[in-house]
Amino acid sequence: MTLIARFKVDSFEPRQVAGLEADWVGVLTFEKTFTAGIIGQAATLFMSAGTEEGARSYVATERITGRTEDGADGSVTVQHGGLESDPGTWFGHIVPGTGTGAFKGWSGSARIRHDDEGAYFEINLT
């Protein structure tokens, strides 16, 4: 089953990490609202490296809590990332064992994609 979960970023906050005072890496926390596919919120820890377009990377872990359009309630943790290069490399996975409620037992991939309507997760449940 494929779930398209559209979201918008509500806020992001740069974070300081002790011992990691460098301009080559950035750490942020995000708050997101999911508006379709899953209705709910997510809290995200995001780390990026690189500043030049075509030479950046990121990795993020986020906890999504909400309800699917068919009424299933729960939470699940997703880890995703990518390397902006030619060609780009992107990944995303549901972290095994992190589902609660109706999301318990969820496994599969979860990649961020973009279209004319904005950003969304393409979640492929296995």
Language-model features and meaning:
Residues M1-T126:
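Beta-strand-enriched cores of mature, soluble protein domains
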